[in-house]
From Swiss-Prot:
SMART domains recorded: DALR_1
Family label: Belongs to the class-II aminoacyl-tRNA synthetase family.
Source organism: Shewanella denitrificans (strain OS217 / ATCC BAA-1090 / DSM 15013)
Catalytic activity: tRNA(Gly) + glycine + ATP = glycyl-tRNA(Gly) + AMP + diphosphate
Gene3D superfamilies listed in its UniProt record: Isoleucyl-tRNA Synthetase, Domain 1
Keywords attached to this entry: Aminoacyl-tRNA synthetase, ATP-binding, Cytoplasm, Ligase, Nucleotide-binding, Protein biosynthesis
Protein's name in the database: Glycine--tRNA ligase beta subunit
GO biological process: arginyl-tRNA aminoacylation; glycyl-tRNA aminoacylation
UniProt GO molecular function: arginine-tRNA ligase activity; ATP binding; glycine-tRNA ligase activity
Keyword Kinase: no
Cell location: Cytoplasm
One cellular-component annotation, GO: cytosol
EC code: 6.1.1.14
Amino acid sequence: MKFENLLIEIGTEELPPKSLRTLADSFLANFSDELVKADLPFTAATWYAAPRRLALSITGLAVAQADKVVEKRGPAVSSAFDADGNPTKAAQGWARGNGITVEQAERLVTDKGEWLVHQAKVVGVQTNSLIAAMAQRALDKLPIPKPMRWGANSTQFIRPVHTVTMLLGSELIGGELLGIKSDRIIRGHRFMGQASFQLDHADNYLSALKEQGKVLADYQLRKAIIKADAEAAAAKIGGVADIQEDLLEEVASLVEWPIVLTASFEEKFLNVPAEALVYTMKGDQKYFPVFDKSGKLLPNFIFVTNIESKDPQQIISGNEKVVRPRLADAEFFFNTDKKHSLASRLSSLETVVFQKQLGTLKARAERISQLAGFIATELNNNNLASSSVDAARAGLLSKADLMTNMVMEFTDTQGTMGMHYARLDGETEAVAIAIEEQYKPKFSGDTVPTASVSCAVALAEKLDTLVGIFGIGQAPKGAADPFALRRAAIGILRIIVENKLPLDLVDLIAKAQALHGTNLTNGNTSEDVLEFLMARFRSWYQDKGIQVDVILAVLARRPTRPADFDSRVNAVSHFRGLEASTALAAANKRVSNILAKVEGELPANVTPSLLTETAEKALAEQLASLQPKLAPLFATGDYQQALTLLAELRESVDQFFEDVMVMADDEALKNNRLALLNNLREQFLHVADISLLQ
């Protein structure tokens, strides 16, 4: 079989930078699936992407499908011939349809009878005749929320398409993609290199684009160049570049020929909180801020241009002129905002509606304040130092910065600017930090607050939203989650679990519901919110790699203290790895089935004198000896050690089921054995329902 390398390039107008990688990944995955479905083997597949192109490179692709033999079964021999041995019309029709005579058919004998068969040789189709249709299907499946039309045709794509190139080795593959006929024309950089050139071979794509077109089509290479050059540029001025992955990917998606340059701004702007300046540089301008070794912002930034200029200073000056007004705005907003305290802005929160049925932002801040104070008191009652006064104060001021000029202009600085203004107002440091950390965790992988006051406020902020929105009947449906309730729920669980806070969801939900008063119309609010949080437990632990049966085993016990829930999950995960776990899980399932069939109340206590079999005596004695050791472990939540002790029962349990008839004819013996099994199961149920383990 012969193999060649395939190139497919779609030349477009500028693609959305935040979608570029997703589009390329999806294009590759879809096309690879097409190759597999078509029985076309290949060695490797990769994608290339730049602002004006999506490309695939398939190496070691078979130039044709392999020939294969397909068995085509005909009618049964019993119905293929009449009594005189002549072919029936059914047999003749089948043979004719397969291009043979009945006499040329072979026989297949199975346990169900004898059949006519034809071993048909199917010649493999040439790859070059399949590529265009497969590529079009792959493109049709791309995740494009808002496709657009261009020109006079009805073709739709994320951006207008100007060129299509499909090469199998040096062979040009004919056909159309997205209404554009395939040819060898590749467009280069808009301002450097050749505007367009002809590509002679699939293998020369990257090198020809680089040398003739001044385009680096390799996305990962552009990322690596930008990162390395930005780090070197920052080091040259004694700093460290702030290169976050999402911004790096966006910048790499904006340029075809990355050139890294360093610029500066006036030091006076450093009097403005660094977060506001960084937000302006990164969010608006796509610049990389530079910090010194101690983490202090420097009056410099690094940016990436898409052209190799003979006069880079002109480009630097241009970017400095662009960013200066934005920094000046931030300075003006900061100086203006400082004239009014956060507390003085509380009355203005009355003018902003949080949600029509849930009241204004001022009402929301007051609820958060009371709930945060309640949570802090709960933590204090459990010997965790937490100032309920600070928590209540931070909750009250938590939304005040939304009324500042800075946050109105730079929305992502909410919370952070509240912290800075709180410090300027003379609020305690705990209050200031809690105002900033109320929104944490903001995204998957983000850190959670650790200070007790911050935890109280962050929990209150999320619980108020969660309970309120559920209370007015607007729970998330399907993928829609306009109030980000799933993120809020995961945040609540993470804060409690990662800080091992002794808080009960039932108490927190009840308090939050009470604070909403008559605003809520859903009569099942508390139950619905608790169920929602329990469901988040499952998805969160699955994302962490915990087996589903482990999660279900714990969920069956409905523990409502997240820290306790986590301890149980970890204990059951550990137990699942023990040699005895499989047998004990099966035994628990058997016990559960037996007890489920018992009518009436189960007997509570085991009567030693009614234990007649050696195996049941051994199990009862071992269980009795373990219970004094288990009780303190259950009380302190040391579930892992408890299950480790219970694993010692394996042999006794196995022997019991081997030797003892539970449902004995003697009612007293039967009830005593049921009591023993019930006692056994209750010990495991102190942790989880391990009968659910697979």
